[in-house]
Amino acid sequence: MAIHLYKTSTPGTRNGAVDSQVKSNPRNNLIYGQHRCGKGRNARGIITARHRGGGHKRLYRKIDFRRNEKDIYGRIVTIEYDPNRNAYICLIHYGDGEKRYILHPRGAIIGDTIVSGTEVPIKMGNALPLTDMPLGTAIHNIEITLGRGGQLARAAGAVAKLIAKEGKSATLKLPSGEVRLISKNCSATVGQVGNVGVNQKSLGRAGSKCWLGKRPVVRGVVMNPVDHPHGGGEGRAPIGRKKPATPWGYPALGRRSRKRNKYSDNLILRRRSK
């Protein structure tokens, strides 16, 4: 969707850039309320995920990541805003009367038809196993485990590429730059996730970010020594270290954050680029 640029009529709209308005009128049988527990805190009330809290109430939309309506054509009826993700969602009316939400593929418009199955056309929005796709196909919503539903490349603008097939596995290049193996029987959706211009958004003011449930970020250099390794000093002091550190004292730049000895280490041919 297009990016709407605000005029500088008030300080809050200066340099503001948001998505063009996509209305949301969700179906009652495809939404449910969710209790957002703690907003970044654990059961003891201690902050475990910083910079979270507040935000507008949300209703969760049930998204069909499995695409298990096999060989039944569906029609895109609406393209809606989803407060729980950056990507837009589509309401699909299937031929058997079923109604479901899916991620909006880039370029899909109201009235387009989609289908999922084993021998379906290589068309944007269609879902099929990797073994039936030609090399070089752009895909999203990729399964890791057969039947569990898509788990990879689901963010706005995300796209992966099928680069090889050998034996029981297919080789994919993911949006992060990682190259890994996945079973050829796993399914994926053809095309790229829509709303590719989401990274061009500029909220313009702090209040707009608070509506999203994101709290202010404070630099460690302006904290006290008890709160951050960069804190302390008289006036504007340097961090006092050779290299930047996290609030818990670990190296902030270049340290690997992936858990060691995971079962999928053997499936990763090239780790993600920094």
Swiss-Prot record:
Transmembrane helix recorded as keyword: no
Region (Disordered): 1-21, 224-274
Keyword entries, A-Z: Chloroplast, Plastid, Ribonucleoprotein, Ribosomal protein
InterPro entries: NA-bd_OB-fold, Rib_uL2_dom2, Ribosomal_uL2, Ribosomal_uL2_bac/org-type, Ribosomal_uL2_C, Ribosomal_uL2_CS, Ribosomal_uL2_dom3, Ribosomal_uL2_RNA-bd_dom
GO function terms (MF aspect): RNA binding; rRNA binding; structural constituent of ribosome; transferase activity
Keyword Ribonucleoprotein set for record: yes
Main localization, broad class: plastid
PANTHER family for this protein: LARGE RIBOSOMAL SUBUNIT PROTEIN UL2M, RIBOSOMAL PROTEIN L2
Protein name according to UniProt: Large ribosomal subunit protein uL2cz/uL2cy
Provenance organism: Gossypium hirsutum (Upland cotton)
